[in-house]
């Protein structure tokens, strides 16, 4: 496999702030980008989500797109209805935080996040330490063992992969608890399509694996 290893242009991070407020939408394109999720409450319940600046240079236009605003409206309605959404809001963009655009070597694409309690952590197929390894990830580990002789790990946490240039990307970045596919066709797929197109057009020798 040929690997292109570029240097990061800028390690500064841009923050996305997902919040509950009655102020509705507010978007800023300065050092921080704010996505306001109105949950029909005056309580500010926000979490910072970091995205590497190198990603923001590629996808910044998406934040103002009509489809993305509709996606935010959908998530806002989910919160207003007290729906539980996975992964936790601070981990929704974990794939972009862990793997800067300029360091992407491999893209693994899943379908949508795990929908069980405590499973999804923002990296496709990955679970936090201490969480039982899901069947799909067990199968991945078994194939790695069978094909390459790699010892089957005891933990399902894949952040070491992401920090070596493997972008662990779900086509849909959120899901309602216990309802697989519940956030499909709400706008996430358009967003991740842009991500994939940007990588294919601006990075060289990247390997794409569609596992969803």
Q: Where in this protein do the model-derived segments appear?
A:
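Short, intrinsically disordered low-complexity segments enriched in Ser/Thr with adjacent Pro
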Residues: 4-12, 18-21
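N-terminal cationic leader/targeting segments used for protein routing and processing
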Residues: 8-14, 27, 31-33, 44
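Residues in and immediately flanking transmembrane alpha helices
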Residues: 15, 20-26, 123, 183
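Short N-terminal signal/transit or membrane-insertion segments
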Residues: 33-51, 55, 94-106, 157-158
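Polybasic, low-complexity association/targeting segments
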Residues: 37-79
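A polyanion-binding, active-site-adjacent surface
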Residues: 61-210
């Amino acid at each position: 496999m040929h690997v292109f290893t570029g240097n990061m242009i800028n390690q500064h991070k841009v923050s996305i702030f997902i919040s509950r407020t009655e102020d509705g939408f507010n978007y800023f394109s300065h050092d921080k980008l704010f996505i306001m999720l109105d949950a029909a409450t005056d309580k500010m319940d926000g979490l910072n989500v970091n995205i590497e600046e190198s990603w923001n240079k590629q996808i910044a236009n998406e934040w103002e797109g009509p489809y993305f605003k509709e996606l935010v409206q959908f998530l806002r309605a989910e919160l207003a209805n007290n729906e539980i959404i996975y992964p936790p809001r601070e981990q929704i963009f974990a794939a972009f935080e862990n793997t800067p655009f300029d360091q992407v070597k491999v893209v693994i694409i899943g379908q949508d996040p795990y929908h069980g309690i405590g499973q999804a952590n923002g990296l496709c197929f990955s679970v936090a330490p201490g969480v039982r390894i899901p069947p799909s990830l067990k199968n991945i580990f078994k194939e790695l063992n069978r094909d390459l002789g790699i010892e089957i790990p005891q933990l399902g946490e894949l952040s070491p992969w992401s920090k070596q240039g493997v972008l662990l990307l779900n086509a849909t970045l959120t899901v309602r608890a216990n309802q697989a596919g519940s956030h499909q066709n709400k706008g996430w797929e358009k967003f991740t399509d842009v991500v994939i197109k940007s990588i294919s057009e601006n990075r060289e020798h990247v390997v794409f694996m569609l596992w969803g």
